[in-house]
Amino acid sequence: MGRIASFLAMAPLLLACGPALAETVLVKYHGPVSLDAFVCAEVKEASDVSRICYDSAERYLVIRLRSTYYHYCEIDAGTVQSLRTAESKRQYFEARIKGSGKDGPFDCRTHPVPKKYRL
């Protein structure tokens, strides 16, 4: 009976310390994306770019511009690293990643969203 009483006393603590839920963000034109497989970096400098999250295995970028998240597909790690280290992240983003309309080099309308992130 002592073991059962000990377990019952500990049960609320075990439940309270359950697994942490991964952060999920709402990506414009796509929907919710779990960031559990991403490496994210907050951008501390004055920029419209405020967060950069990258899943290197899937070559998938989620970026926050002001308060809105956008996504980019089939983007290589070198381009993301250059974005992270760029003196002006907004200028680098505009020139090398975004594009205009559907002609962006990593636009998810012309490059497939990784299967694990499809809705």
What are these regions (language model features)?
Residues 6-16:
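Bacterial N-terminal signal peptides
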Residues 18-22:
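Sec/Tat signal peptide C-region and signal peptidase I cleavage site
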Residues 1-4:
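Positively charged n-region of N-terminal signal peptides that target proteins for export
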